[in-house]
Amino acid sequence: MRKTIILLTLISLFVLLSCGGSSDESNDTPTPPVTITLRSQSISEGAEVESANTTILTLSYNTTVKVTGTGITLNGTSVTAKSNSTTSMAVDIPLALEDGTDYVVKVAKNAIVSTADPTVSAPEFTLNFKTKAKPVSTIASSPVIASTNAAKNLYTFFRNQYGQKVISSVMADVAWNYSLAEKVHTLTGKYPAMNCYDFIHIQVPDGNGWIDYSNTKPVTDWANAGGIVQLMWHFNVPKSETTTIGMDGSGVTCSPSETTFSASNALKEGTWEHEYFYAQMDRVIAVVLNLQEAGIAATWRPFHEAAGNATAKQQASWTKAWFWWGADGPDTFKSLWIAMFDYFKQKGVKNLIWIWTTQNYNGNSSSYNQDSDWYPGTSYCDMVARDLYGYTAVQNLQEFTEIQDAYPNKMVVLGECGWDGSDKTGKPQGLMPDCWSQGAKWGHFMVWYDGNAGNNTSTMVSDDWWKDAMSSPNVMTRDQVIY
């Protein structure tokens, strides 16, 4: 019996040892080798892309990868790629592209390797693509409606300077003066070439407002000193049909969320909106005709930034127009623009150069559509503007290029500029000489005001920004204006 127990014990021990051996063999099985496979690329083979919108080629793989620093070229020139900022399984290759050019990107063996095993290389990669040819810019030789000698001469002056110099301008802090232009002169020794006046308070009852728009002396004095006049209009409307407009300018707004005023109804006879729309245009027209009689022409930028955020690809509560004139969509906006254009023409206004303001892609073509469906048409404006705040010189170039390509027969101008909101140092407007050298050759720029700026000009750029701009050979100042 004892022998039997010993024998069974030995058999059990043998079985256990055998199982242990089997387990050891299992642990010694080699790990499958790492392989790298390209899963996707942001530019397809043979694609035709827009140079301004294509700055990166992203290659996505099946595993985590890293770049080694060599072996990636664009048309034979080495480029420095880097890991994608959102995933370790992709690589971004920077692209500096020109219009109308064929390109070849090559990724050599060992240029991209496995993070886990750097001896494992991504497969060699070659991509052929091209950029779209730049549309030929054919600026119209004459304005769409302006026919006074002063207006035709001013338009010709802008056209001749376009691409040669950028015309400087400053906003008159929504007042009827040129006090900020005086501050720029005190700081730099030069006046901006153009001063912008806003009809924002013209709805205040006659005789009760702090601005007497019928007194055009602040405008004629500027023009007689050699300056160019720009006019714009924050078109305020009553908050409701029964709202009384206060002597202090209260009771009105531009925001569609603060008024019952309907942009569509402004085009329908018999509505209170229609009556108000035309009554306010009559007020502005009276002032413009006084300037016309005095031999003064002006640029005219009404209904600016119409699209607001309405072109966002993914709609949300905030993706809408921020001014009432855009609240009912692009078709109504275009009808409003044309109604104003035709009414001004009917009333004999012939001294204005019309500027339409685009939102372009709101600076992000992946999130916004371009607002070309808001464009009133080539017969209804002379220039296309873009308002930019906190944009670098490189970003200015991208915006300028996109707009010029979209509207090649119009002069492209920087309608407003300055720092981004309250961020005076973190997101300033790019220096104008830098914008110019990058290729953003705006027809003119207009710096917005800020009474709390804490600088010598009360504008949304620094004193050094103004000094840099007004001393640049590419920036036109008032003493250089001749037309």
Protein language model regions, located:
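Aromatic- and acid-rich polysaccharide-binding/catalytic face
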Residues: Y197, Q370-V394, W448
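C-terminal motif of bacterial Sec signal peptides marking the signal peptidase cleavage site
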Residues: V15-S18
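N-terminal module-boundary/linker segments of secreted carbohydrate-active enzymes
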Residues: T131-I200, P205, G209-D212, P433, ...
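N-terminal non-catalytic regions of secreted/periplasmic and cell-surface proteins
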Residues: D24-G71, P123-P135
